[in-house]
Amino acid sequence: MDVTVSELLELFLQSPLVTWVKTFGPFGSGSQDNLTMYMDLVDGIFLNQIMLQIDPRPTNQRINKHVNNDVNLRIQNLTILVRNIKTYYQEVLQQLIVMNLPNVLMIGRDPLSGKSMEEIKKVLLLVLGCAVQCERKEEFIERIKQLDIETQAGIVAHIQEVTHNQENVFDLQWLELPDVAPEELEALSRSMVLHLRRLIDQRDECTELIVDLTQERDYLQAQHPPSPIKSSSADSTPSPTSSLSSEDKQHLAVELADTKARLRRVRQELEDKTEQLVDTRHEVDQLVLELQKVKQENIQLAADARSARAYRDELDSLREKANRVERLELELTRCKEKLHDVDFYKARMEELREDNIILIETKAMLEEQLTAARARGDKVHELEKENLQLKSKLHDLELDRDTDKKRIEELLEENMVLEIAQKQSMNESAHLGWELEQLSKNADLSDASRKSFVFELNECASSRILKLEKENQSLQSTIQGLRDASLVLEESGLKCGELEKENHQLSKKIEKLQTQLEREKQSNQDLETLSEELIREKEQLQSDMETLKADKARQIKDLEQEKDHLNRAMWSLRERSQVSSEARMKDVEKENKALHQTVTEANGKLSQLEFEKRQLHRDLEQAKEKGERAEKLERELQRLQEENGRLARKVTSLETATEKVEALEHESQGLQLENRTLRKSLDTLQNVSLQLEGLERDNKQLDAENLELRRLVETMRFTSTKLAQMERENQQLEREKEELRKNVDLLKALGKKSERLELSYQSVSAENLRLQQSLESSSHKTQTLESELGELEAERQALRRDLEALRLANAQLEGAEKDRKALEQEVAQLEKDKKLLEKEAKRLWQQVELKDAVLDDSTAKLSAVEKESRALDKELARCRDAAGKLKELEKDNRDLTKQVTVHARTLTTLREDLVLEKLKSQQLSSELDKLSQELEKVGLNRELLLQEDDSGSDTKYKILEGRNESALKTTLAMKEEKIVLLEAQMEEKASLNRQLESELQMLKKECETLRQNQGEGQHLQNSFKHPAGKTAASHQGKEAWGPGHKEATMELLRVKDRAIELERNNAALQAEKQLLKEQLQHLETQNVTFSSQILTLQKQSAFLQEHNTTLQTQTAKLQVENSTLSSQSAALTAQYTLLQNHHTAKETENESLQRQQEQLTAAYEALLQDHEHLGTLHERQSAEYEALIRQHSCLKTLHRNLELEHKELGERHGDMLKRKAELEEREKVLTTEREALQQEQRTNALAMGENQRLRGELDRVNFLHHQLKGEYEELHAHTKELKTSLNNAQLELNRWQARFDELKEQHQTMDISLTKLDNHCELLSRLKGNLEEENHHLLSQIQLLSQQNQMLLEQNMENKEQYHEEQKQYIDKLNALRRHKEKLEEKIMDQYKFYDPPPKKKNHWIGAKALVKLIKPKKEGSRERLKSTVDSPPWQLESSDPASPAASQPLRSQAENPDTPALGSNCAEERDAHNGSVGKGPGDLKPKRGSPHRGSLDRTDASTDLAMRSWPSELGSRTCSTSATTTAPSNSTPIARHPGRTKGYNSDDNLCEPSLEFEVPNHRQYVSRPSSLESSRNTSSNSSPLNLKGSSEQLHGRSESFSSEDLIPSRDLATLPREASTPGRNALGRHEYPLPRNGPLPQEGAQKRGTAPPYVGVRPCSASPSSEMVTLEEFLEESNRSSPTHDTPSCRDDLLSDYFRKASDPPAIGGQPGPPAKKEGAKMPTNFVAPTVKMAAPTSEGRPLKPGQYVKPNFRLTEAEAPPSVAPRQAQPPQSLSLGRPRQAPVPPASHAPASRSASLSRAFSLASADLLRASGPEACKQESPQKLGAPEALGGRETGSHTLQSPAPPSSHSLARERTPLVGKAGSSCQGPGPRSRPLDTRRFSLAPPKEERLAPLHQSATAPAIATAGAGAAAAGSGSNSQLLHFSPAAAPAARTKPKAPPRSGEVATITPVRAGLSLSEGDGVPGQGCSEGLPAKSPGRSPDLAPHLGRALEDCSRGSVSKSSPASPEPGGDPQTVWYEYGCV
């Protein structure tokens, strides 16, 4: 059979209609084979039987029960069925079948087609309609209800198709209705019209069909006309077959044989039926005979009964007369006794009534309590559900937020990386241009004539090289993108594996829960059955009680009647007594004699009657025994039948289960195949990655070609022809590059396809898991069903036993009662003699006692049953509650499982993201290492090139070649490592595959065990053994994955180093290209001269051309003629070939037809032979069959004869047995009569004695009865009292319960009020922070000093020759200022020591205890800290004061010696000393008390906790000094991850300013904690690396830290918009380099990279500063060219602001690369951009640059740029990611982009010398700080609680904006609303337009802006930075608003940066880094307490207040900013 047919069969047999049919009984001969079941349906036998059940009316047609795949019989059965259905609908249901009737022919002929299945569905549908509307419909509907819900729904839909759809079945009952609504009539008429139309169409079609068929018949007859001769002969001859052909004869013979076989069958059936008829008649005759016998017996028994009654009546009358006197006396006494009993019963009734009333009351009370308790329980459940839902929603939102943050981080980081790369290349190109110009000028001055053609070529070649390098870089970036895509693919594969494991675990949990649920359900069912049984028993007892009461009432009435009767008898006796005693005595004697005679006669009769009675009893007992045996046999039969049925069901269920298991196995195999295909697709994707590597190789080849081009350039210097060739080759290269780009696009498309494949793979794996779960659930279900079956069987057997026992007992009781009644009657009759009275007395007494006992028992039972019923009621209630709870728990469980799956998925995605980011960071670090090494080489070569310009350009090209070779080697090594990684991943996947296969095998084994064992236990144990191994394997896989990631990250970092190198090369090539273009122009002039000569030659050639044209015309004519001839010949040849082909085709067709004909003839002959063979076979079989039939008939007759003989013998045997039994009975009767007479005589004598004894006993028992009665009444009264007391106690308990609930509610309200008071306390403690603002005035003074210092430096810089001397003096001054600043800071810290900490309060915040611990140690003197700093590593430094002279000496020595090249090494050593802990694990990260640097050590993992713990230290570190900020940047975000930052401080010029800006924000944030602030200030100032070194940067940093901005209270800061806090970040960013110098290396950076130690990459500066010097004018010109202009701020009058604005324009673009700072921040030393820039800060390597040292503008990155430095940089906190980089470019204006900064800085230097003195200090300051702000903005992207947030991207765009806006605000002395500065960069919008929220919040920003304007540079910086800074510090910001730890600063929360990862992610609420105050406030960080809202207003007020208050003091900052400029200039 076809596969599709089997599928159709399965679908059909699983349809609801077939499942309904199965309820009528198993079909398919009990087997579960789909085909046999289906054929059984198609044959129509089973369906006809169903129809017979529905419609039992007799039908004339017989069904063929043995179809044997006979089409005709099948059709016959189906037609009978359809006819029956049709008649039933019309006659019984009054309905008309309108739908097309099932096509019986189609079903009969081709039952296995899809159409025939549809027709059978029609049949089943019509049968269903009959069943649902027939008389037995309730029974059928009950069966339907027992089916599954899904099948029920399907059956209901089918029923509606029949009953409701008038198009299928039309209801005719409306005809009988008298009134029909017009709407219904209208609908009916419409449907009728439609049916009419359809019938007419069908009639027309049928007529057409008839016409066609008749035409066909006529045609066929015409084709074979019967010849007249043959016909006549046929008529005449008796054999008409003679005219037929041999084939027709054979056919007819076969048909004849078939009809004979049928005839035989029919005859056989007839014979069977006749035999059955004879048998039944015989049985009827026997039954008639038996009936007659029974009737006769019945008549005889009736006659006997009548005679017995007559005798009894006579006897009774005689006995009554004789014994009346004695009986009356006895009755009197008995009545008296019964009277006492009546009283007792009345009392008992009253007691029972009272008990009932009490019970009803208690029941009502308990029900009330129950309802109340249930209501409470329901409320609790609802609240729990709501709570869980809210928690899940919260969790989902948090997950979404985290993912958004991560995504934003990644995007921003990428953005920054790209911008940094762009700026680097621009810087390099500008620098090269500047060098070339300088060299050209020098050459012109020395000797203009010496300028040679070779030099120009050199320049052109260098420019061209630069261009090629740029192109190379773009290609590298595309390759990197493709690599990232391949990494994503691999990660998705890992995700799939993890999801599969988690799914397995969840499925196991679900299975366990299901088993528990099933157990609980079973227990519930057991309890329900028990309760039902108890209820039934209770009802029975109640009915027994009622019957007893009725009996008692009857007895009382009888007794009263007897009493009346006795009274009358007494009166008559008294009257008689008055008559003379003599007469009386005589009468008595006469009566006695007469009585004696009558007694003797009666005794004789009695003995006879007793004998007869005994005989009857025996007969009865025998009959009863027989009846019991028959009943037992019947029961056993029923039981066996039930067991058979049950076993059959079990077998069917097991078979279905096995089929399902097999189907599931097939499905799982299919899924495995799909799995393999998906794995193959993964392999193809890996091949794609290999292709990518091939592209990289092509790229290397291009590099090699570039080298060749350079060589060609050397050779082509003197020839123009060679130049032209070069250009052509260049064009070819460009084309190749375009092709490569196209290839890259194709690869991207392939990557997308791979992603789609991954998605499909995930869906397939999910389906696989679902199927596995369904398999497991099905196996569990089968087990549970088996267990339930076993339990049900046991219960059923127990119930059956109980039932049988009850029936037996019942039968015995009934028989006993009957016997007892009969015996009592007989005894009464016999005792009507003299002894009757005694016997009656005895019997009555016994009855009384029995009834008393029964009554007592029944009352006891009743009470026990009542108690039990109460207990059961309670249990029932409990069970119901439990069931309700169970359902709720199930729902909760489902919800939880869903949540668990969601959480698991999110967790896996988060894990994978983490892994990705770690990989990226490691790759970046490795790339940075490589780049640093290569740059060292390249840098040295550059120096040689610059120094040896005259020696020629050969060396340059050699250097380039060497560099390219090294790059090739590095890329090869990277590829090898990647291949290793891919192989490892392949192995992991293979292991996963093996695990899956092993699990599948285990599942198969479990299925097999299921089939074998029906028990439950073993299978479950096996199924739970496997997950452990899996989990272990997965853990090992995860552990093994870590190192691989690190290697990959190293490789990526190397690649990126290579990319930067290539960019530089491209820049050089571009310069060379420009030179070549100039040479081209020169050559073109020469070409002009040659062209004049060519004109003369052209004239000569014109004459020749004319002659040539004539010749060409002639040749053309000849060619035309030739072509025409050739075309004609071609056409002829084509025609010829066509004809040939046609001919061959015809021949082949002819041959094929001949072959077919031969095949057909052969087949026909074979068929004829088969036919003949079949005919012979048929004849032989028919003969054998007839012989067998004869034998069978003979045997049947024999069998009948034997049966008759057997019956006759049986009858004779029975007669003989009856006679024998009668004789035996007669003998027994005689013997028994004799014995009975003797016994009667004995019993009469005994009875008299017993009577007297019993009377005595009766008296005694009566006395005891009275006593017991009294005791019982007393006990009853006592029980009543106890019951009432119990009820009272319960009521009191309820009252107390209510009281308890009230108290509980009060307690809750008290708790709420307590929390409110705590919040209030927090607010009060916040207010205390405002007192700390006064301390900032000292800081502003220090800033003024630093500004003056800068001015002096600028003046000194004007004279180049005296530069070195001035530099030394300047360093001394700086050191002095630093010492002065240290002293001032110590004084300030001493002042702070005397501040009291804010009042303690009950802190619900987790980190409160940690804060307390941290705050305490800070109160110790700064001197202790000084001692510990020198010896301790950075972590210890944190807790000690690092200002000790020993630590600072090395720095000073370095500062004094500006020319020494060992500077870098010293710095590196210092960093080793302080940063030795970089390698420490997270364990070292715990912040120590009072540690200023603590944030730098924090790790991402601990970020949230540290955010809380680190407040105290953060306060100090931020407020005190730049060094603190640089070292403890992570305070703001527990993990310092601004690599860029460390680098940012490559030049001193910037150091000072950044520190100023940065400190201010810090100050603000931490003002609120005076004690911690003071101590932290001490520690941070002393511990700052700058301070230790004694460099001027430290001094400036400190001076700024006390700027007027510090006066802003921490509250203000918390609420300030980003404008307010960003500057701080900026500042920090600039100063970040100091950190590496001395402060602990930010651990995070080191740990993340896990690579080079701090000193790696440190490179000595060029030996001679003079060689690096450049004139200021030249540098300014260069920078002006490179830096694009940008929008000027509103205050245009300020020149310095203009300069800074110009400088800051580029940064807006470039500043973004905050995070890239990790990678490239190090690469961007400012020395690139500003030749005069001083590298005072330990450039990222941590190398301190001396203040006066010149750094030569250089392509190579200083070691600071090397990857090792990256780690320190990262550590340098979060002040702002973007800052880090900007700071690298020390040019103050461009806080973000180093290049732009340097350019703007150079401009600032030149102008500062002239304008700064006259420029208003504040304005300059304002202009300066804003520019720095840009970088800090980067911090904006981080929320308080988010660990891994860096917002490099925003800073870039916002830095500019921010820089501008503050200027405007300051110029106007009022903020103009949220300027671009405060505006967050919405990464989604990528525009500076303020978002809607920010537009709504101008008020907050305007309030803060004025403060910023007046506050000086720090304040200005704050204007743009407050948000970002706050965000950045949000963990610390919380401390800033110290009094309220729960609600960290709202405004700043918007974007806190935790540099955990390279990827940036903006938190949801705070996602837009620069959002204004209004936006920031509502945003809640995870760690924030919910009481944020109340403080929003206050925070805003504080903002405005702080700004106003701060405006009053003259801000030292205005001067400070120019000072910073001066300082920068001096450094340069």
Curated annotation (Swiss-Prot):
Region listing for DVL1-binding, in residue ranges: 2026-2028
Residues that bear Phosphoserine: S227, S239, S486, S1444, S1601, S1806
A molecular function (GO) term: guanyl-nucleotide exchange factor activity
Comp. bias (Low complexity): 229-245, 1439-1450, 1517-1534, 1568-1588, 1792-1803, 1902-1924
A Pfam family that the UniProt record links to this protein: HOOK_N
Stretches the record annotates as Disordered: 222-250, 1011-1043, 1419-1724, 1736-1803, 1816-2021
Motif (PDZ-binding): 2025-2028
Chief location bin: cytoplasm
Keyword annotations from UniProtKB, A to Z: Cell junction, Coiled coil, Cytoplasm, Disease variant, Guanine-nucleotide releasing factor, Neurodegeneration, Phosphoprotein, Spinocerebellar ataxia, Wnt signaling pathway
Coiled coil (residue ranges): 247-428, 456-1017, 1045-1094, 1139-1393
Domain of life, per lineage: Eukaryota
Gene Ontology terms describing biological process: apical constriction; cilium organization; cytoplasmic microtubule organization; cytoskeleton-dependent intracellular transport; microtubule bundle formation; mucociliary clearance; negative regulation of canonical Wnt signaling pathway; negative regulation of microtubule depolymerization
Localization per Swiss-Prot or TrEMBL: Cytoplasm; Cell junction
Biased composition (Basic and acidic residues): 1419-1428, 1689-1704, 1879-1897
Domain Calponin-homology (CH) residues, every copy: 11-131
UniProt cross-references to PROSITE patterns, sorted A to Z: CH
Modified residues (Phosphothreonine): T1954
Compositional bias per record (Polar residues), positions renumbered to this chain: 1011-1024, 1589-1604, 1842-1855
Motif (GBA): 1661-1691
Gene Ontology CC terms, in alphabetical order: apical junction complex; cell junction; centrosome; cytoplasm; extracellular region
Biological function: Required for activation of guanine nucleotide-binding proteins (G-proteins) during non-canonical Wnt signaling. Binds to ligand-activated Wnt receptor FZD7, displacing DVL1 from the FZD7 receptor and leading to inhibition of canonical Wnt signaling. Acts as a non-receptor guanine nucleotide exchange factor by also binding to guanine nucleotide-binding protein G(i) alpha (Gi-alpha) subunits, leading to their activation.
Family of the protein in this entry: Belongs to the CCDC88 family.
Subunit details: Homooligomer. Interacts with DVL1 (via PDZ domain); dissociates following initiation of non-canonical Wnt signaling. Interacts (via C-terminus) with ligand-activated Wnt receptor FZD7; competes with DVL1 for binding to FZD7 and displaces DVL1 from ligand-activated FZD7. Interacts (via GBA motif) with guanine nucleotide-binding protein G(i) alpha subunits GNAI1, GNAI2 and GNAI3 (inactive GDP-bound form); interacts with higher affinity with GNAI1 and GNAI3 than with GNAI2 and interaction leads to G(i) alpha subunit activation. Does not interact with GNAO1.
Domain-related comment: The GBA (G-alpha binding and activating) motif mediates binding to the alpha subunits of guanine nucleotide-binding proteins (G proteins).
Disease connection: Hydrocephalus, congenital, 1: A form of congenital hydrocephalus, a disease characterized by onset in utero of enlarged ventricles due to accumulation of ventricular cerebrospinal fluid. Affected individuals may have neurologic impairment. HYC1 inheritance is autosomal recessive. Spinocerebellar ataxia 40: A form of spinocerebellar ataxia, a clinically and genetically heterogeneous group of cerebellar disorders. Patients show progressive incoordination of gait and often poor coordination of hands, speech and eye movements, due to degeneration of the cerebellum with variable involvement of the brainstem and spinal cord. SCA40 is an autosomal dominant, slowly progressive form. Brain MRI shows pontocerebellar atrophy along with a global reduction in brain volume.
Protein name: Protein Daple
Protein's organism: Homo sapiens (Human)
